[in-house]
Regions:
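Conserved alpha-helical scaffold segments that buttress catalytic/binding sites
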Residues: 2-49, 54-196
């Protein structure tokens, strides 16, 4: 089971968070996969958060992402009057190879989708969208994708899935699962006529 690959959040990180400052916040409403509490039962939750460190196939020179900073800001947000249960399942570490990371992410997404759980991925690079997209293969629904990017990432230069080729792989995927693709923020001077 790929969920067992998820690393818990360190107790030292959770102790840094001032609960008084975060009163009424998301932090006080969610169950967190921590060193002390272990992995929450994901079947009890409507929304699960997962941090992903993988960025080796990013188009951009990248350094390790600071998922702690992302979480600190996310946890500060106020929880509305919603009737949903939310869990932070921790972080998926890099696999030995990028393909190992893709496979683990695919399995996690597929498992959570089978329980009708909404998955929110934090971190990682654009190419991770491909294994997430592929996890919908066993579902009847078509997939809508919204990307916020200055380019369309439709390059066809190689078989490698990267931050510049992932959308081409999705659009021409044999599963025909893509219903709609919307790109927000593309810059005309960075996109070829063929892409537009």
């Amino acid at each position: 089971m790929s969920l067992e690959l998820l690393k818990p959040l360190k107790n030292s990180f959770l102790n840094e968070i001032d609960e008084n400052y975060l009163q009424g916040s998301l932090y006080n409403k969610i169950k967190i996969h921590s060193e002390s509490d272990g992995l929450p039962n994901h079947e009890l939750f409507d929304v699960c958060l997962v941090g992903v460190e993988e960025n080796r196939n990013s188009f951009f020179e990248s350094k390790k992402q600071n998922l702690k900073s992302i979480r600190k800001e996310l946890y500060k947000l106020k929880f509305g009057n919603w009737k949903i249960e939310v869990s932070d399942l921790g972080d998926l570490p890099n696999g030995e190879t990028v393909d190992d990371s893709y496979h683990a992410l695919y399995d996690i997404c597929k498992e959570l989708l089978s329980k009708k759980t909404i998955l929110v991925i934090m971190g990682g690079s654009n190419d991770l969208l491909y294994p997430i997209f592929k996890s919908f293969d066993t579902h009847n629904e078509k997939v809508n994708i919204v990307s916020i990017d200055n380019q369309f990432d439709l390059y066809q230069d190689s078989d490698l899935i990267s931050g510049r080729t992932y959308m081409n792989k999705i659009i021409f995927d044999d599963s025909n699962k893509l219903n709609d693709f919307t790109n927000i923020g593309f810059q005309r001077h960075l996109c070829s006529i063929d892409e537009i």
